[in-house]
């Protein structure tokens, strides 16, 4: 999106939902030789800098929120390993926020979910590794060993 489009999105108080894995990893080859186009493809850093609210989705194969999160952090094209629009890479915390608080805001439920606070639903996951400290290339291999929705266990691995 252009800066003018993002200004308009912000003025209209819209929320942008994107699937970084689709745009950067699956559709990445078309951006390899077009750095300007790569920079504008799901330019999350620019969204945040301009105050645009955004959230991540995962409705495409491979279905993995962690692969999607990795795509926003690494922005690596799958065939060549080229980093597409490196200045648009997100920190791990910003990418995590897009799934949690961004998703809640997208659904008009930011007062009920999206962060762990008193009075909110206890929706959370315990991950198989430390997202903030692990090597970047292993982020797609993360999985949930325990998931709670509304404070109730909905998933638990046998070894947790």
Q: What are these language model-derived features?
A:
Residues 7-14, 18-133, 137, 142, ...:
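His/Asp/Glu-enriched, well-ordered alpha-helical/loop segment
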Residues 1-2:
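Short acidic loop-to-helix transition motifs that present clustered carboxylates
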Residues 159-160:
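Residue-level structural signal for beta-strand termini and adjacent loop
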